[in-house]
Amino acid sequence: MKKGTVLNSDISSVISRLGHTDTLVVCDAGLPIPKSTTRIDMALTQGVPSFMQVLGVVTNEMQVEAAIIAEEIKHHNPQLHETLLTHLEQLQKHQGNTIEIRYTTHEQFKQQTAESQAVIRSGECSPYANIILCAGVTF
C-alpha cells in the first residue's frame, strides 16, 4: 500500500500495486535481475544514486513488514549493514510496527528476486547492497 508520493512513475506504480506480503527488491548495480522480473533501472553512474538513497525513497512510500538481506553483507560490507539496520529501526518507529529481518545466503537471495514484483537497481557499487522488502498493510 502506498504511503506518500514519489516522482518516478515506475516506482510509484509498482508500490501502488503491492498487496500484503508481495515483495520488492532494491539492489546494487551488480545484482543479476531475472528476465521474468520487472526491472526499474535508476543507475546513472557508479554510486549514483546510492543504495540508501533509493531505499529511503522506496520506504517513504511503502509499508514494510519484513526485510530479507544476504548474510554475506555482515562480513563484506559491515558499514552498510549497520546503516541499513539503523534505517530499518527508524522505519519501524515511523510506521509503528516491527519489521522482521531475515538473513539468507546470497545465492538464495538471487533466487528469491525472481518472485518479486520488481527489482529497483541503484548505482551502488559496494558488495551485497541488496534488500528484499515485504509489503505490509497500513491498517
UniProtKB/Swiss-Prot annotation:
Result of changing H20A: Loss of pyranase activity
Family the entry assigns: Belongs to the RbsD / FucU family. RbsD subfamily.
Keyword entries, A-Z: Carbohydrate metabolism, Cytoplasm, Isomerase
Taxonomy, superkingdom: Bacteria
Pathway linked to the protein: Carbohydrate metabolism; D-ribose degradation; D-ribose 5-phosphate from beta-D-ribopyranose: step 1/2
Positions contributing to substrate binding: D28, H106, Y128, A129, N130
GO molecular function: D-ribose pyranase activity; identical protein binding; intramolecular lyase activity; intramolecular transferase activity; monosaccharide binding
BP term (GO), one: D-ribose catabolic process
Listed EC numbers: 5.4.99.62
Catalytic site positions: H20
Catalytic activity: beta-D-ribopyranose = beta-D-ribofuranose; beta-D-allofuranose = beta-D-allopyranose
SUPFAM superfamilies noted in UniProt: RbsD-like
Gene Ontology CC terms, in alphabetical order: cytosol
Phenotype for H106A: Retains one-third of the original activity
Task performed by this protein: Catalyzes the interconversion of beta-pyran and beta-furan forms of D-ribose. It also catalyzes the conversion between beta-allofuranose and beta-allopyranose.
Subcellular location(s) per record: Cytoplasm
Name listed for the protein in its UniProt record: D-ribose pyranase
Subunit structure: Homodecamer.
